[in-house]
Amino acid sequence: VIMTFYGTITFNQQISFMRLISVNLNGIRSADSKGFFPWLKAQEADVVCLQETRIQPEQLTDVMLEPEGLKSAFEFAVKRGYSGVGLYFKKKPDRIQRGIGWAEMDTEGRFIQADFGKLSIVSLYLPSGSSGDVRQNFKYKVLEYFEKWLLEAKKSGRELIICGDWNIAHKEIDLKNWKNNRKNSGFLPEERAWLTKLYTDYGYVDVFRELNPNPDQYTWWSNRGRAWEKNVGWRLDYQVATPGIAAKASAESIYTAERFSDHAPLIIDYDCRL
């Protein structure tokens, strides 16, 4: 935040970046009870992309609707206590789009987009297929539909950042126990190849990986065993962007000092102003 005193003295002039946070909350009420909102206030983020809010409009509290310094927009699942995405933002967007335009996906509350000038920011929650064949087949349908959407979005010429829980670990480096998970949803060859296609054929960029090539960088840990304690995790949360805005990314972090969810917040700073 740039503060001006009597219109002449400016403090914090060095702050000229955009901070973008993506976090799967595994229930916004649960995250609230674990201290998420005091932490969020301290981040001074420009935009926050939420997934798996698991809430209905009438259940939103004042702090959920307007955390200090932020406004909000939400997209809800029809089914109560399930899925749902949202956005927090300092600057009012020019436009908000709730849903991607395909009923099968939109009834589950998996997509919301905010446009700021020539930049679009999406909060995305791709389905998990881990419960069985029915959901895995639905996941493939969503990937097929979303791929077409991504292709059209690229053609539009707009800059785009898609933040969210993609429910896919791309490469062996992106999960601890990759050998034992090659036949499991989230690390299936078809899912991984789909992500590769987005990067190599369509030119989208995995922003975190451009900044941090190191192993053991995870954003989700199973609640079974001592996965969190031992850092036996998966990198399922991404900020995927068009090349122009991706090139402006300057710093990344995965916040693990506190635990608000089974996912950790993914924070990336971009050398631009919203």
Summary of predicted features, one role per range:
Residues 47, 68-71, 142-232, 236:
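Metal-dependent phosphoesterases centered on the DNase I-like endonuclease/exonuclease/phosphatase
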